[in-house]
């Protein structure tokens, strides 16, 4: 990883300054994933003439079976090519940021104007992928060089394996351009309690994104089964088609904010030492999703000098991002449980409950952008206290309650709930058009016999569309304690402790989700969400820092509470997997030179996660919840920073 910045400032005189910033970031990561496997949505047919087909017409035909003389074709839709090796993933990220502006003072007004351009590029390359076309060619050869899918992983020659291995690449690029101007006046006019300030500003933004997929993924090079003649959009084994996508938009915004005192201490009003207000509004116009105006109001009351009571109300707005609006298709491989087939097992007495059902084979989870999305809206209010006791210097306690109601949330239903809805609708004589199934085979018909249910084929694709979902309410409590101990014989100390509790997180249940709940099925991201899927009830962090002359040190601790992972269910109890709490500590020591060649240079030696705590196990890609935990382990670092006047 490389991260570098350059900051420039130049004083023009007359209270005017030019400033600039140049930033560059580059990172490269490598990882491995399991060997490539076929999807039921893109099977491979082994021809009856293939050399290693045990049911074919060639020399390796099995004896003693009632097989036609011309042999049989064999379809494989759940085969993992172990001898091709694990997929090797290389990701390179680069980004840069250019900023130039000017700021100054004109009379009672402070002003600032700048232009910004930033761009980022990600190149995601995966080696040891498999071309379906080349794989089928290798399988259907009519000599011993053919690829054998019916033997141990070591039976095929490396030349044969290499004949169908490919590299697959995806490139993603984003760009942001911005020009703004803002100005403020702390003394716009005076009230009896003091001066009222005003800030105004305007901004223009340009956003752009492009996703360019490999030709074998975006439909340029497709896979046509040479036996059945069926054409599939993707030629990459284990991946559905991914069309290229792009989008851009312009945003014009303006804001105004006014703040000032209504009551001051020298007015000597009982129980109102101070009373301050803030009112603000912001307007935004998007060229793709419309415009909006949102207000904000804040009131701060000091009954006495040491106690502040503050309250606020604000409305918010979030436009769908460009990928949610414009992405044609994104695809992932998932393993949903097919409860319709499970119901057949229950009806026949093969299993007793849904908890005994197993997941399906690999199913393509297709996600589609939606240009008709509406912006999200939110309404939030808060009430807080700040107490600074007069009998202890530099000690502060804070407590803030907050409540947010969000409407028209942009999201996508989980692949499991989409599959569950197919189960519900089939029980009632219909089906879910967003669940694509293969034609029922003779094996499927035999499986459903005696269950009282109509036979169906395996799930092939589950399609999810970004949509505006129902409302969500969230509330919580933030607590803080801060203490500074200055000018002791041992130096200066600072202590900070923060804790956050989620009181409520409730996603409204829509009509489709209510249907599933009535059947006793688990709903993802619906209902009470406290302690569910990355939402621990409690989180906390604490910092202790010390400095003495040129020396300094710090200790940091972080606590993340336990929560349940709804993606994993314990077989013996049927309960969700409990992700344990996690506590880590980090420490550093530093020295700052204040004279000589290295003046204003700081050297820091630190250890992150000093106790080498591993993240708790979760049902995620790498085995842990990346939004809350990390697998970095104990990390020792040495940093050098220099300031130039």
Predicted regions and their residues:
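Transmembrane beta-strands of outer-membrane beta-barrel proteins
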Residues: 18-20, 111-113, 196-202, 273-279, ...
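Surface-exposed, low-complexity loop segments enriched in small/polar and acidic residues
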Residues: 1, 5-7, 11, 15-251, ...
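Transmembrane beta-strands of outer-membrane beta-barrel pores
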Residues: 24-28, 106-108, 115-123, 187, ...
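Residues on the lipid-exposed face of transmembrane beta-strands in outer-membrane beta-barrel proteins
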Residues: 6-10, 100-104, 181-185, 254-260, ...
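C-terminal beta-barrel architecture of Gram-negative outer-membrane proteins
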Residues: 332, 491, 495-596
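Short loop/turn motifs that connect adjacent beta-strands in outer-membrane beta-barrel proteins
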Residues: 12-16, 105-111, 188-196, 263-275, ...
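Residues that define the transmembrane beta-barrel architecture of outer-membrane proteins
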Residues: 2, 92-96, 175-177, 248-254, ...
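C-terminal beta-signal and adjacent terminal beta-strands/loops
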Residues: 396, 405-408, 503-506, 556-568, ...
């Amino acid at each position: 990883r490389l991260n570098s910045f350059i900051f420039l400032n130049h004083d023009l005189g007359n209270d005017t300054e030019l400033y600039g910033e140049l930033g560059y970031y580059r990172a490269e990561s490598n990882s491995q994933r399991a060997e490539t496997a076929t999807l039921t949505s893109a099977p491979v047919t082994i021809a009856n003439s293939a050399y290693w087909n045990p049911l074919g017409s060639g020399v390796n035909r099995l004896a003693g079976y009632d097989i036609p003389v011309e042999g049989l074709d064999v379809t494989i839709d759940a085969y993992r090519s172990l001898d091709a090796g694990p997929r090797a993933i290389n990701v390179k990220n680069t980004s840069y940021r250019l900023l130039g502006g000017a700021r100054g003072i004109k009379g009672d007004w402070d002003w600032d104007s700048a232009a910004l351009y930033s761009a980022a590029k990600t190149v995601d390359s995966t080696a040891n992928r498999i071309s379906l076309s080349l794989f089928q060619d290798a399988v259907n050869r009519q000599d011993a060089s053919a690829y054998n899918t019916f033997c141990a992983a070591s039976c095929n020659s490396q030349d044969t394996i290499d004949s169908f291995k490919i590299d697959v690449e995806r490139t993603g690029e984003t760009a942001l351009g911005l020009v703004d101007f803002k100005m403020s006046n702390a003394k716009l006019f005076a009230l009896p309690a003091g001066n009222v300030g005003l800030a105004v500003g305007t901004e223009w933004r340009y956003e752009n994104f492009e996703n360019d997929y490999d030709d074998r993924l975006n439909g340029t090079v497709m896979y046509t089964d040479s036996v059945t003649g069926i054409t599939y959009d993707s030629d990459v084994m284990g991946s559905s088609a991914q069309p290229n996508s792009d989008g851009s938009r312009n945003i014009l915004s303006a804001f105004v904010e006014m703040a000032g005192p209504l009551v001051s201490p020298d007015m000597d009003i009982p129980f109102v030492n101070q009373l301050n207000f803030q009112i603000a509004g912001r307007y935004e116009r998007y060229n793709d999703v419309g415009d909006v105006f949102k207000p904000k109001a804040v009131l701060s009351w000091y009954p006495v000098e040491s106690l502040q009571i503050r309250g606020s109300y604000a409305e918010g707005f979030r436009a769908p991002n460009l990928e949610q609006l414009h992405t044609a298709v994104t695809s992932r491989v998932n393993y949903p449980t097919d409860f319709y087939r499970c119901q057949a097992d229950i009806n026949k007495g093969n299993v007793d409950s849904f908890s005994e059902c197993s997941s399906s084979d690999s199913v393509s989870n297709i996600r589609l952008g939606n240009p008709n999305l509406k912006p999200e809206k939110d309404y939030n209010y808060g009430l807080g206290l700040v107490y600074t006791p007069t009998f202890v210097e530099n000690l502060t306690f804070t407590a803030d309650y907050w409540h947010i109601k969000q409407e028209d949330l942009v999201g996508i239903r989980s692949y499991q709930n989409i599959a569950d809805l197919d189960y519900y609708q089939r029980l009632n004589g219909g089906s879910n058009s967003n669940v694509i199934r293969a034609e029922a085979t003779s094996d499927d018909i035999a499986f459903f016999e005696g269950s009282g249910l109509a036979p169906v084929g395996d799930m092939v694709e589950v399609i999810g569309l970004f949509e505006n979902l129902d409302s969500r309410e969230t509330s919580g409590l933030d607590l803080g304690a801060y203490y500074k101990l200055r000018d002791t014989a041992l130096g200066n100390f600072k202590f900070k402790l923060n804790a956050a509790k989620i009181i409520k997180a409730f996603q409204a249940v829509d009509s489709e989700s209510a249907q599933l709940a009535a059947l006793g099925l688990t709903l993802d991201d619906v209902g009470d969400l406290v302690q569910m899927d990355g939402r621990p009830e409690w989180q906390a962090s604490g910092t202790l820092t010390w400095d003495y002359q040129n020396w300094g040190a710090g200790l940091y601790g972080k606590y993340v509470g336990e929560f349940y992972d709804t993606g994993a269910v314990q077989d013996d109890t049927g309960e969700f997997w409990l992700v344990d709490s996690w506590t880590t500590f980090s420490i550093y020591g530093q020295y700052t030179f204040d004279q000589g060649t290295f003046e204003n240079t700081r050297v820091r030696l630190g250890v992150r996660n000093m106790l080498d705590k591993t993240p708790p196990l979760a049902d995620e890609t790498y085995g842990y919840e990346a939004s809350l935990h990390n697998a970095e382990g104990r990390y020792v670092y040495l940093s050098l920073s220099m300031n130039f006047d």
